[in-house]
């Protein structure tokens, strides 16, 4: 092992974690004290299988006689340069700078399992004074349109970064997990025109047989994976992510601020598009593209969307889709969101349609939710292909028209959808959404589009209840001892028809609007 003095490489000014503004091709270390550079280690790997990259730590020598050592840096996913001497063969590079030549960084490459493990010391017996640091940059270089089965990137100290020039597809699961570092995907501004929103349904619509011409991501997000898991303890999560079958994000004290671009369903194995985001104390902001004044013709891929957003103490903001299940919960943080229903038209009491649910709940944080005009879709039942079986005699009589039996409606978990004609949206009403909005001490303000039809029930112990909207009929407006109860209807004769909105509070005010603001 040889070392070079890299103090002339213009390292950062201090030993802070790497800045988001750090040049992508900077050759300097991530900490100023790491002035000795090891020879760059290189490992070739084949595409098409699994790939695992891990950064772990080891204790080093006896802690009683050693000094602590910090690790800083990144694990990066990048596209191979066009002028690369390796052509289009994928490879890994490990670039190490250390503050003392005695520091040992272990690198292990298991070619059979496709696993790279890099271990950095937490402590070391060193003669020189500190602070001591290991600067580590691991880069996975991929050819364009590389494909993998599964991808696992894990680290204790490092930031995990996907560079905007990458273009790979993972058919299975991709997991990015770090304890102290951030997780950063490219931002929508860096991706540029590749994330322009579609304004027609041609790329996502299904014909009567349930086939689809959308084999790839319609929005051109460069990193594609059916399932993506992103986890960090103290770092933040940022960037632009595809929403295919599952997008899960978890942070303890770090914040989450991302854009999510929905992608078409996989016709051969249709699943819901599930978005799950959780934090303990960090804030959450996820933005999915919705139909608004700037993109009034946008049509998302017709799918069943499932959303679960939860924070113990952080606020929740952003724009989301309302599908079969949508839950937003925070203990002490506020919930301020814009939502767009992507649902089947009609009521749950008609044609056996399942009831869709939308819930927002806090303990002390305020709630403000706006429901936009819906995008209506129609289910195309998915028929799983099974090998034909030869007919065989049966001692049982076939079921006749007069025999009792149950018709089970198709499940949205295994179904294809097509977008209804956008011109027909104006003649349809939103009648298939059951909502609940509750808080203990904070105010709640909910607005629904003019096409909403159903019942509204609200109850508050000491707070006021106000409403606005054409066509709302007062069924009950009752003021009792330490309580106020209201029941309204629009376009229905009973609570069993159309949508149903339940609002409850102990001390906060309640505001409900249909087709207007209040």
Regions found by a protein language model. Give the residues of each.
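Intrinsically disordered, low-complexity terminal regions
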Residues: 1-518
């Amino acid at each position: 092992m040889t070392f070079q003095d890299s103090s002339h490489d213009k390292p950062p000014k201090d030993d802070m974690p790497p800045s988001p503004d750090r040049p992508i091709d900077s050759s300097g270390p991530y900490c100023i004290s790491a002035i000795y550079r090891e020879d760059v280690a290189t490992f070739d790997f084949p595409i098409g299988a699994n790939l695992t990259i891990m950064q772990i730590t080891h204790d080093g020598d006896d802690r009683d006689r050693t000094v602590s050592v910090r690790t800083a840096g990144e694990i990066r996913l990048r596209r191979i340069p066009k002028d690369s001497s390796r052509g289009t063969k994928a490879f890994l590079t490990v670039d190490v700078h250390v503050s003392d030549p005695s520091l040992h960084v272990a690198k292990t490459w298991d070619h059979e399992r496709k696993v790279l493990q890099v271990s950095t010391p937490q402590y070391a017996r060193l003669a020189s004074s500190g602070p001591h640091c290991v600067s580590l940059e691991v880069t996975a270089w991929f050819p364009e349109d590389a494909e993998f089965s599964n991808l696992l990137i894990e680290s204790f100290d490092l930031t995990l970064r996907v560079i905007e020039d990458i273009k790979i597809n993972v058919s299975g699961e991709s997991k990015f997990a770090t304890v102290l570092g951030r997780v950063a995907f490219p931002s929508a501004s860096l991706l540029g025109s590749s994330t322009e929103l579609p304004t027609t349904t041609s790329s996502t619509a299904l014909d009567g047989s349930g086939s689809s011409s959308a084999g790839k991501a319609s929005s051109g997000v460069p990193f594609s994976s059916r399932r993506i898991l992103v986890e960090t303890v103290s770092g933040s999560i940022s960037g632009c992510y595809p929403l295919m079958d599952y997008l899960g994000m978890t942070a303890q004290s770090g914040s989450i601020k991302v854009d999510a671009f929905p992608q078409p369903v996989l016709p051969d194995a249709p699943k819901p598009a599930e978005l799950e985001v959780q934090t303990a104390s960090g804030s959450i902001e996820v933005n999915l593209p919705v139909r608004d004044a700037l993109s009034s013709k946008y049509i998302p891929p017709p799918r069943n969307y499932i959303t679960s957003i939860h924070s113990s103490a952080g606020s929740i903001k952003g724009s989301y889709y309302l599908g079969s299940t949508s839950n937003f919960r925070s203990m002490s943080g506020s919930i301020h969101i814009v939502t767009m229903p992507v649902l089947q038209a009609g009521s749950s009491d008609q044609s056996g349609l399942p009831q869709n649910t939308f819930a927002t709940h806090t303990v002390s944080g305020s709630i403000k939710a706006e429901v936009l005009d819906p995008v209506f879709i129609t289910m195309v039942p998915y028929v799983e292909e099974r090998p034909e079986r030869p007919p065989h005699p049966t001692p049982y009589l076939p079921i006749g028209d007069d025999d009792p039996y149950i018709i089970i409606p198709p499940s949205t978990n295994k179904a294809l959808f097509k977008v209804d004609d956008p011109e027909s949206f104006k003649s349809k009403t939103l009648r298939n959404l059951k909502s609940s909005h509750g808080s203990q001490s904070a105010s709640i303000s909910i607005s629904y589009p003019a096409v909403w039809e159903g019942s509204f029930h609200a109850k508050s112990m000491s707070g006021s209840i106000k409403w606005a909207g054409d066509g709302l009929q007062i069924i009950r407006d009752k003021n009792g001892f330490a309580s106020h109860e209201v029941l309204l209807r629009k376009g229905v004769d009973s609570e069993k028809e159309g949508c149903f909105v339940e609002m409850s509070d102990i001390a906060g005010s309640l505001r409900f609007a249909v087709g207007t603001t209040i």
